[in-house]
Amino acid sequence: MDTIIMIPVATAIVSLLVGTVIGYAIRKHSWEQKVQNAQNDADHILADARAQVAAVKAEVNAQKQAAEAVKQSAENTKKEKILEAQEQIRDYKQKTEDKLNLKKDDLARQENRLKQREDTLDHKNSLLDEREAGLTKKEDQLKQQYTSLKAKLTEADELVEARRQKLYDVAKLDKEEAKKIVLNKLSDELVKERAELIRNSNEEVKAKADHYASQIIVDAIQSSAADTVAETTVSVVDLPNEEMKGRIIGREGRNIRSFEALTGIDLIIDDTPKVVTLSGFDPIRREIAKRAMERLIKDGRIHPARIEEMVDKARKEVNDDIYEAGESALMELGIHRMNPELVKTLGRLKYRTSYGQNVLSHSIEVGKLAGTMAAELGLDEKLAVRAGLLHDIGKAIDHDIEGSHVEIGVELTRKYHESDVVVNAIAAHHGDVPKLSFIAELVVAADTISSARPGARSESLENYIRRLTELEKIAKSYQGVKQAYAIQAGREVRVMVEPDEISDDRTVILARDIRNQVEKELDYPGNIKITVIREKRVVAIAK
């Protein structure tokens, strides 16, 4: 019974132990499972945390890289902006320096011009001072000479009286004879003093004026040149054959009559082969006739209606050429704003000659010379050029209007409102009225230079012979002149004097007197040189 009782107890104990063990095992397994789950959860959480940390790190790195990129971009942009700003600064600095250099160059050029002008003014002032000093010195010398001459005259009067008395007492001459001897002696002495004074004055004036005047004139002449033409009153037109003469004459000479009536030019048909001659004093009409005849010959149809048509065309063509010649002259001299009618009148000078010199070419040359000399003297160069160009404008229409070319030129320029200086230069260039300006003086000088240069002008044979004869006649009219010769086409007169009648001192006075008479009585182009030669030969024959 006890055993039976022990078995259940043992079983119960064993069961309890087994249950305890099993419960412990189950509980342990459960705890292990929970621990494992917790560990897994912790691993998951740690993995998630690590993933989040990695993501945050990646995001931080990305942001850091982005920040670095932004920073780098900002740095690059900053550098670019700095470089761009530096480039702009360099460009601005370079431009500023270039502008400053240009301004410096301009200022330097202006300074050089001002310095040159100042030097020129100083030079001119020096010349004026020298001239003033020379004039003052000359005035003092003249005063001294006047005082000396006055004293000499007083002394001469006393000497004359003393000699008169002495001659009267010693030679027993009457008063008139003694007076004649003394006056002849005194006249010889005064002639000697006068000749010496003339020589000294001429040398002094020449020494002071030659260099400066020559320099101005040479500069003016070197900058100018003009062609020369031969003066003529006929034009010759070539014909292709002799038959053309008959066609030009026409039935009963009607073509010639029509041509001459329309042109105002004589048509001469003679035995000269293959030419016809146009004769007339108006060069413009002659040019119109020549062009019309050349057109008719080329066309071949010659009858009054065709002649009238060709003359009208030639007249229009010549009028166009005249205006173009006037405009070309203005362009060559740089003259602007001139009345068209005055330009047309100026162009007519192309067909006008004076002593064989083309008047338009001469006027252009005078304008250049006057302008050059005006510039050298500090005067208005453009006004001088204008006055020089227009000084002979009256010659363009002096065949059509009554009056001298000077009067016509003055009236014409006043009509078209040219300045008073230009009008006075025209009026005074032949000495008809006083010169009221330095420019008028320059126009006269330029006109003389242009006319007097070799080859510029020629004369007709009749005028040439007459002028030479009158030159020799004037020279021979003086007492003591043995012979006189006009040489070098009348540009020099050589006067041979009797050595026993004319002294060396008196030759100076004789040359001066002949020059004054030539200037007063003769009209001539250029200058005439008067040369007085006194030669005494003594011959002794040894036997």
From Swiss-Prot:
Residues 359-452 form the HD domain. The chain crosses the membrane at residues 4-24. This is Ribonuclease Y. GO terms for cellular component: plasma membrane. Residues 233-296 form the KH domain. Endoribonuclease that initiates mRNA decay. It is found in: Cell membrane. It is an enzyme of class 3 (hydrolase). Belongs to the RNase Y family. It is a single-pass membrane protein. GO terms for biological process: mRNA catabolic process. It comes from Lactobacillus helveticus (strain DPC 4571). Keywords: Cell membrane, Endonuclease, Hydrolase, Membrane, Nuclease, RNA-binding, Transmembrane, Transmembrane helix. InterPro entries: HD/PDEase_dom (IPR003607), HD_domain (IPR006674), HDIG_dom (IPR006675), KH_dom (IPR004087), KH_dom_type_1 (IPR004088), KH_dom_type_1_sf (IPR036612), Ribonuclease_Y (IPR017705), RNase_Y_N (IPR022711). The keyword DNA damage does not apply. The gene is rny. GO terms for molecular function: RNA binding; RNA endonuclease activity. Its EC number is 3.1.-.-. SUPFAM superfamilies: Eukaryotic type KH-domain (KH-domain type I) (SSF54791), HD-domain/PDEase-like (SSF109604). Gene3D superfamilies: Hypothetical protein af1432 (1.10.3210.10), K Homology domain, type 1 (3.30.1370.10). The keyword Cell membrane applies. It holds the Pfam family RNase_Y_N.
